[in-house]
Amino acid sequence: MRSWSTVMLAVLATAATVFGHDADPEMKMTTPQIIMRWGYPAMIYDVTTEDGYILELHRIPYGKTNVTWPNGKKPVVFMQHGLECSSSNWVVNLPTESAAFLFADAGYDVWLGNFRGNTYSMKHKNLKPSHSAFWDWSWDEMQQYDLPAMIEKALEVTGQDSLYYIGHSQGTLTMFSRLSEDKVGWGNKIKKFFALAPVGSVKHIKGALKFFADYFSLEFDGWFDVFGSGEFLPNNWIMKLVSESVCAGLKVEAGVCDDVMFLIAGPESNQLNATRVPIYVAHTPAGTSTQNIVHWIQMVRHGGTPKYDYGEKGNKKHYGQANVPAYDFTTVNRPVYLYWGDSDWLADPTDVTDFLLTHLNPSTVVQNNKLIDYNHLDFIWGLRAPKDIYEPIIDIVRNDVLNGS
C-alpha cells in the first residue's frame, strides 16, 4: 500500500491534471486561514479541560449579511466534528455549501470545536504527544471533559447561558453520552441538539471498523501492538489488508480508497464536489488515539454504547465492577433533531432505527429525518446538504429565537 504522503501526491496530481489548475492553497491552510480566505472573520480560543488537555476552538462571530436579533445578541451555534476529523469539516466546501459559512451569513455566532488529539488540539499542561500517556483516552473522556470545556468557553465569551449544538458522527455520540450522564442540569446549556449521522450503536457498521471487529476477537490482547500505541497510525500491512477487503469491487479512485477516513465512513457518494476532494483528503483524517479506535471496535462487538472496556481487572479499578457499564440514552432530556442516511456505513440506518430510536425518550425526538442517498460524509460535504439539512436547521433556530424560546 502506498504511504499517506504518496496517496496525497497522487490525489493532488490527479486533481491538477483533470481540472486544469494548480494545487488549491486551501490544502495547506488551517481552518482559520480558510475562513479568512473567503472574507470571513476568524477567531481562535484555547480552553483547558479538567484533565489538562488544551483544545483549540475556532469562531466566525459574524457573516457577510446584517442580521439583527430581538435581544441584540446573536444566537450561538456550536458545531462538533466526527471521528478522525476536525473543525475544517465545516469550511472545506465553498461558502455557499459549507455549514459554518451558511450559518454565519444567516446571522449566527458560529463556534467550531476540536476534540483532543486532532490537528488543533495536540497540547496538554504536563504531557507531550510523544508521551504514551498523552493518548490514554477515548471518546469517554471527550464527552466527560472536552464537550463541557468547549461549550462553557463559548458561552463565557458570548455572555449567553445556552446554545444550539450541531454534531456529526462522534460529535453526536459524545453529546448523547454527555446528556445521559448529566446529573446537575448541565444539559440546560443545550437549547436544541441537531444530530447529523447520529451514532448510538454501531452493531451493523460496515467498512474498516467492521473489518477490525470481525478480524480480531474480543479477547485479543494485541490491539496496541497492531495499531501502535498513541496516535492512531495503522501499520501499512494492516491498511493494505483492509483496503483490499473493504474496497474490493467499489468504483472509486485508489487514492481515495487508501484514505483511512473513507475506509471508515464509506467511499461511495454521488454528491461530493469532485474538485474539492484533494482538500478533504488534505485535512482528513485529523487524528485521534488508538484507544479511541479500539473503543469504537468494542462498540461494534458490544452492540450498544459501552464505556471503554479495560478488561476485568481494569474495569474493577475504573468502574468498581468487572463488567463494563453502558450509557443510558433513555435519560437524554434535550430536544433532539435526527438527520440520518440510508447509505451510511458508520451510522447505519438499522442502528438508528433499532437502537437509537428505541433508546431515546420519544418525547425528546422532535424530528426524525431519513435522507435518501446520503453516506456518512455527505452530511458535512454533500452538495445537497445545504438544502436538505443546513437551511432547515437555520430556520428552526431562527423561529425558536423569534418565538422567545
Curated annotation (Swiss-Prot):
Induction of the gene: Up-regulated in the intestine by fasting. Down-regulated in response to a high-glucose diet.
pH dependence, record text: Optimum pH is acidic.
Any GO CC annotation of this UniProt entry: lysosomal lumen
PROSITE patterns from the UniProt entry: LIPASE_SER
Positions glycosylated per UniProt: N66, N273
Record localization: Secreted; Lysosome lumen
Annotated signal sequence range: 1-20
Active site per UniProt: S169 (nucleophile), D344 (charge relay system), H376 (charge relay system)
Domain of life: Eukaryota
Gene Ontology biological process terms in this record: lipid catabolic process
Record keywords: Glycoprotein, Hydrolase, Lipid degradation, Lipid metabolism, Lysosome, Secreted, Signal
Chief localisation class: secreted
Top-level EC class as recorded in UniProt: hydrolase
Protein family: Belongs to the AB hydrolase superfamily. Lipase family.
Function, as annotated: Lipase that, together with lipl-3, plays a role in the response to nutrient deprivation by controlling lipid metabolism. Specifically, involved in the breakdown of lipids during lipophagy, a process during which lipids contained in lipid droplets that have been delivered to lysosomes by autophagy are degraded.
Official protein name in the record: Lipase lipl-1
Gene name as annotated: lipl-1
